[in-house]
Amino acid sequence: MSDFKKSETTIQSGQHVLIRLPSEGLKIVHLQDTGIIGLGKFGSFEVSNILGYPLGTSFEIIEDHKVKPIKSISTLDLTDSDETVQRQELTKMFSDSAENNQNIINIGSKIQKLSKDDIDELKKSGASSNVGQMIIEKMIAGHEGFDKKTIFSQQKYLKRKQQKFLRRFTVDYLGGSELLQYYIEKDLNRVLDLSVETLGLMLTYSNVRPGGKYLIIDETGGVLTYAMMERMNCEGTIVSIHENEHANLIALRYSDYGNELETKTVKSVNWLQFIDPQSERIDWTDLPDEEVKKIKNKSQYKKRRDRALQINEVIQLVEEGNFDAFISVSTLNMSEVLEYVLPKIGGSRPIVVYNQFKESLLEVQQALSGDKRVLAPSIYETRVRPYQTIPGRMHPVMTNRGGGGYILWGTRVIPHDAITAVGKGFAKRKRVETPSKTDTGTVEVQNDQENSA
């Protein structure tokens, strides 16, 4: 295993980080001791200038690929006195606002007095974000309809211009949530419309923790596996079922855990090995050292030996069963899959199935409702609604990405058919009246309850 240890607090060379741009774009980079990283229109910077700072620090690009730390991407880095002046200027700027946008007349670029040539000239005057801030201030001053906007519209306008002209970026830790955000922006279909909040809900419902043994189906390219490894601190076992020759876990290339630790934690098994492990087991016997020395291609022999041991190891895990949870992010028909999976899950352990379509989970829920092995299968969904805030006021953002998918959650139980539950809903057994004879020979009917009294 590599001696490199991934840091969760400090920017250091040798690890992958997530760079957030003013345009809300995301970029994953691998940091080296030296080198220049380009950020497109936002400029480029020398890697050595950001090493040693805490993760989450924002930087501003200045001349000669140099950077300086700032408070955040959207706020100016000012002294206390300058910050007070800037706050007063912004307050004055936003004080001339309307209650609504009905007085705005859309006449296109004619409403802006600052021409494109003027903006290009300002850009050439320097590479610092101070130039970008100056452009924004001149554009606001030259906007004839700025005072007719509501204060919320004014802030949105200011934010759009900051995203376009400020040369800034933030370096964040690349965790499971951050990696999912990156794939959502890059290729939403790859992660099956999974949202960050839904991923967190899945890990909570499945009780993922260090030292656990989990059975999963991951069709997100390894994003689910990445998030589980991070939450488990690489302590425990993850058995991933796949339907191809090799499991698609390409997202693990950003993990920085090393091949040895990944191999130790994550085991892959195909469906044939999972359903019929006995026929897929490899009978392997190590050759004596004398015969190994005679082999010309020793590397090929070692690869065959390692593969046989890995396959037999994961088959042994499948045969033992008693997994701590089953987690699925897949497009497979779960009604059929669960018939093979449920016997491998331990009692009182969670079953968590994700699908981007609710109708698919309704079919699974209907199938499990009559199955005594799964208790209370329920479907959940979660939504996070962002809000735009200004001092003293707030309102929800009017447009947001939909989707996020749905989760089916149930508890694996071990039914016992020989036990009959008695309790509420069962009527009491009626007492049987038996005849008894008196001393005179007459028959008298007595109640068993009265006799016992």
Swiss-Prot record:
Disulfide bonds: none annotated. Residues 430-453 are annotated as: Disordered. It is found in: Nucleus. Its main location: nucleus. GO terms for molecular function: RNA binding; tRNA (adenine(58)-N1)-methyltransferase activity. Residues 435-453 have a biased composition (Polar residues). GO terms for cellular component: nucleus; tRNA (m1A) methyltransferase complex. The keyword RNA-binding applies. Substrate-binding subunit of tRNA (adenine-N(1)-)-methyltransferase, which catalyzes the formation of N(1)-methyladenine at position 58 (m1A58) in initiator methionyl-tRNA. Heterotetramer; composed of two copies of TRM6 and two copies of TRM61. Belongs to the TRM6/GCD10 family. PANTHER family: TRANSLATION INITIATION FACTOR EIF3-RELATED, TRNA (ADENINE(58)-N(1))-METHYLTRANSFERASE NON-CATALYTIC SUBUNIT TRM6. This is tRNA (adenine(58)-N(1))-methyltransferase non-catalytic subunit TRM6. It comes from Candida albicans (strain SC5314 / ATCC MYA-2876) (Yeast). The gene is TRM6.
